């Protein structure tokens, strides 16, 4: 093809020379050079253009060497990633077999080759080492879309062995493992975890240990007992909830693993100075603390002391704080679907020592009276937390005279001085259990 093009160009040159025979020699020579340049240029453009491609061969050689180097680097990266993948899977297998030191070595070697190898592996077998079962997973997407984890975990444990075991020891030990306990004993341990303080938060954390513990933590009897302890006979029926756990989590209730706190600040005018040119103003701050207990008891304290010093004293009802108010509370849900908390509290009785100095003197009779306070609070949720806010709706003082039986009631106006109480969780309140659920 190149030779045909060259012949065509040669004929064109000859025809041009025949037509320009009458031109001057200088113009003829210039025209001949131009035709030769065109012919050489077309020849170099043609594939396999002979000696004309000698100048472009170094470029093509450099380009080819770059492509070969890139291909080599790509193959090396693939080989390195495959080696890291094998080491990582070997580490997972060693970890499941209990050889932790060997597993760490393989993990280190794999991540030295490819730091993010963990995210580049598609597992065909579950890599978790919780000892519940090495169940094979056909599709990760289907596993993530399962809504009912409880039935799924029960199915996995059923397929694992003929004898149902909630968990298996990860490491061999001469001591008796918790998996050897019967189901009844293990459930009793879980009731101790919840305790009489209704620490369901610890139960949820315990369910994250393994699949077997997840099944135990979802036992309906535990959640039913917790609901009965909070609402009593008013929660005999599940409607409109689908489970006891759903009722406990979604139905409005007061919280027991902390204390509700409010802070009130106001400005008070001081006494005028002697010269009459200066009058002091005082900023007054005080706190209200309300602590609820699952058995229906409540504590309330109004004091200027900050939470750092007061909160530890409210852990139990046997506090030595003199100004503490003790009583009972109940939950009430009106027709407007607003849950309210009503409490009757009174000051802790103090035992007065007998004064022997004046025992022979006749004293004027003192009219004895019982004083208690009636409190009404509306339970609300704010932010991302549930049932963490109490709004004042009622506060009154009732004084009953024992001699006449009459009761004097003084109602206080709910103004801006009654700031809402916000819940603060206290870890020490659920640090240990005194009685099981």
UniProtKB/Swiss-Prot annotation:
Pathways involved:
Protein modification; protein ubiquitination
Query: Which residues does this entry mark as bearing Phosphoserine?
Result: 126
Q: Where in the cell is it found?
A: Cytoplasm
Q: Describe the location of the F-box domain by residue ranges.
A: 175-226
InterPro entries in the record: F-box-like_dom_sf, F-box_dom, Hrt3/FBXO9_C, MIT_dom_sf
What is known about its subunit structure? Answer: Part of the SCF (SKP1-CUL1-F-box) E3 ubiquitin-protein ligase complex SCF(FBXO9) composed of CUL1, SKP1, RBX1 and FBXO9. Interacts with TTI1 and TELO2; when TTI1 and TELO2 are phosphorylated by CK2.
> What does this gene product do?
Substrate recognition component of a SCF (SKP1-CUL1-F-box protein) E3 ubiquitin-protein ligase complex which mediates the ubiquitination and subsequent proteasomal degradation of target proteins and plays a role in several biological processes such as cell cycle, cell proliferation, or maintenance of chromosome stability. Ubiquitinates mTORC1-bound TTI1 and TELO2 when they are phosphorylated by CK2 following growth factor deprivation, leading to their degradation. In contrast, does not mediate ubiquitination of TTI1 and TELO2 when they are part of the mTORC2 complex.
- Biased composition of type Acidic residues is found at 16-26
Region Disordered: start-end pairs: 1-29
Task: Spans of TPR repeats, please give.
Answer: 84-117
Q: Which organism is it from?
A: Bos taurus (Bovine)
Q: What is this protein called?
A: F-box only protein 9
| BP term (GO), one | SCF-dependent proteasomal ubiquitin-dependent protein catabolic process
Instruction: Report the SUPFAM superfamilies cross-referenced here.
Output: F-box domain (SSF81383), MIT domain (SSF116846)
The UniProt entry's GO CC annotations, sorted and at most eight, read: cytoplasm; SCF ubiquitin ligase complex
Which keywords are on file for this protein? Cytoplasm, Phosphoprotein, TPR repeat, Ubl conjugation pathway
């Amino acid at each position: 093809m190149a030779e045909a093009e060259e012949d065509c160009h040669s004929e064109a040159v000859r025809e041009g020379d025949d037509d320009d025979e009458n031109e001057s020699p200088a113009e003829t020579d210039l025209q001949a050079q131009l035709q030769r340049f065109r012919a050489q240029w077309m020849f170099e453009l043609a594939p396999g253009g002979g000696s004309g491609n000698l100048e472009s061969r170094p470029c093509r050689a450099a380009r080819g060497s770059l492509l070969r180097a890139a291909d080599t680097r790509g193959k090396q990266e693939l080989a390195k990633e495959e080696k890291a993948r094998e080491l990582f899977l070997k580490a997972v297998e060693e970890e499941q077999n209990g050889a932790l030191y060997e597993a760490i070595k393989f993990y280190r070697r794999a991540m030295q080759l490819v730091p993010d190898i963990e995210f580049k592996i598609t597992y065909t077998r579950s890599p978790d080492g919780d000892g519940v079962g090495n169940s094979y997973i056909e599709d990760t997407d289907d596993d993530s879309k399962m809504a009912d984890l409880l039935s799924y975990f029960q199915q996995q444990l059923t397929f694992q062995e003929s004898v149902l075991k909630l968990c298996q020891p990860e490491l061999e030990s001469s001591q008796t493992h918790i998996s050897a306990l019967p189901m009844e004993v293990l459930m009793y341990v879980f009731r101790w975890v919840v305790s009489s303080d209704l620490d369901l938060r610890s139960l949820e954390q315990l369910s994250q240990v393994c699949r077997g513990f997840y099944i135990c933590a979802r036992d309906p009897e535990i959640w039913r007992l917790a609901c009965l302890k909070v609402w009593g006979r008013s929660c005999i029926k599940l409607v409109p909830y689908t489970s006891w756990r759903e009722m406990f989590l979604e139905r409005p209730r007061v919280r027991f693993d902390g204390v509700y706190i409010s802070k009130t600040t106001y400005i008070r005018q001081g006494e005028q100075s002697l010269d009459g040119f200066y009058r002091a103003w005082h900023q007054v701050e005080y706190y209200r603390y309300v602590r609820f207990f699952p058995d229906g008891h409540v504590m309330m304290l109004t004091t200027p002391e900050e939470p750092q010093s007061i909160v530890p004293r409210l852990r139990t009802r046997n506090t030595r704080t003199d100004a503490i108010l003790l009583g009972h509370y109940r939950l009430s849900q009106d027709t407007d679907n607003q849950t309210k908390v009503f409490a009757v509290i009174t000051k802790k009785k103090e035992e007065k020592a007998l004064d022997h100095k004046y025992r022979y003197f006749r004293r004027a009779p003192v009219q004895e009276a019982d004083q208690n306070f009636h409190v009404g609070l509306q339970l609300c949720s704010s932010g991302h937390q549930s049932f963490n806010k109490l709004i004042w709706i009622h506060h009154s003082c009732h004084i009953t005279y024992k001699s006449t039986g009459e009761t004097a009631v003084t109602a206080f106006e709910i103004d801006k001085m009654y700031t809402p109480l916000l819940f603060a969780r206290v870890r020490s309140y659920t640090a240990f259990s005194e009685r099981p659920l």
